[in-house]
Structures are given as C-alpha cells and as structure tokens.
C-alpha cells in the first residue's frame, strides 16, 4: 500500500472511518456528527472484510480521492465476515496504518474483549452510549482529542525508487 496522507479528504476535512454493521447505529452516528457540528468527513463500511478493503485501497475503494485513508478509525467489535478484533490485528500489521488511531466503539463491556482490543493495539475502548446526546458528546470529545489536540506520528515518507 502506498504512503498517503491520513489527514483530510478532498474538501480538507479529517476523515473518520466508521466500521459498523448496524444501520441504526450508523444513522445515529451520522446525526450525532451533524448535531455536534463536527468538521469531519465520515466514511462508513459495514463489515470487517469491507473495512480491510477500504483501508487497503482495494476493489471499489481504489480511488483515494473518494476513499481517503482515515485520520481516525471507529471500530465495532461484533462484525460480520471478519470481527473487529481481526480488523484491528490487520490494521496494526500494516506499516501505512500502524499509527492510525483506532477507537473501539462497541456495546461489549466484556473484560476479555477489552483486554484483547488493547493487546492488539487499540488506542481507546469505549462502550456505545445508550442516549443520543451521550453519543453527540462522545463524538465531540473524540474529535477534540484525536483530531484537534493529539499530535500524531506523521506519515512515513514513500520509499525511494531503486
């Protein structure tokens, strides 16, 4: 995978990749971003295989103008085809993505899930809020911390041609 900027889409907005299979949760997240007036572009994929394809820039996600690398990944754990933990393991094995912040956003509060997520390299593990306003607040805090205040590792330079 080629080295690309992880910071912005074509409009200059930071990109959040939401990996979520529940259409109701996707709709709530989109509404929460709008209500919080977050200056971000949200891309959504519905399962673990689609998340890997998006991040790898393969198939329908080959155009980085339309499918830019994210500045932040919001990852559910309970996904069809490939679990969130498997996606996280794959993300951390990719040099172009190994420093991209991954926030697990899930309904699971199982100690085993929490332990595995952190062991595999999650930057944060958050339980999905029950109330809509809680989600608005949570996304606002994530935006403020990960996309505005946190200093991330700059993307690695592209390797020199031989």
Predicted regions located by residue number:
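Non-catalytic signal-transmission and effector/linker regions of two-component phosphorelay proteins
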Residues: 1-17, 23-43, 49-52, 56, ...
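Active-site residues of response regulator receiver
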Residues: 75-77, 106
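Short, glycine/charged-rich "phosphate-handling" switch motifs in NTP-dependent
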Residues: 123
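The feature encodes the CheY-like receiver
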Residues: 80, 110
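Conserved phosphate-binding and hydrolysis motifs of nucleotide-dependent enzymes
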Residues: 21, 76, 84
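Conserved active-site segment of CheY-like receiver
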Residues: 20-21, 105-109, 129
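Short amphipathic alpha-helix used as the core "switch/output" element in two-component signaling
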Residues: 60, 85-98
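Alpha4-beta5-alpha5 "output face"
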Residues: 92, 115-119
């Amino acid at each position: 995978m080629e080295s690309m900027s992880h910071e912005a889409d074509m409009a200059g907005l930071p990109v959040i990749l939401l990996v979520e299979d529940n259409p109701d949760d996707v709709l709530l997240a989109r509404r929460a971003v709008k209500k919080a007036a977050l200056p971000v572009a949200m891309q959504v994929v519905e399962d673990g295989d689609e998340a890997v394809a998006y991040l790898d820039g393969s198939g329908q996600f080959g155009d980085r103008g339309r499918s830019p690398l994210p500045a932040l990944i919001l990852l559910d754990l309970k996904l069809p085809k490939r679990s969130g933990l498997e996606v996280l393991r794959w993300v951390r094995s990719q040099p172009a993505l190994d420093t991209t912040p991954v926030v697990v956003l899930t309904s699971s509060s199982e100690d085993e899930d929490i332990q595995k997520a952190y062991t595999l390299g999650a930057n944060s593990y958050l339980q999905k809020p029950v109330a809509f306003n809680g989600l608005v607040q949570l996304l606002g805090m994530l935006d403020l911390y990960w996309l505005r205040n946190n200093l991330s590792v700059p993307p690695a330079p592209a390797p020199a041609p031989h």
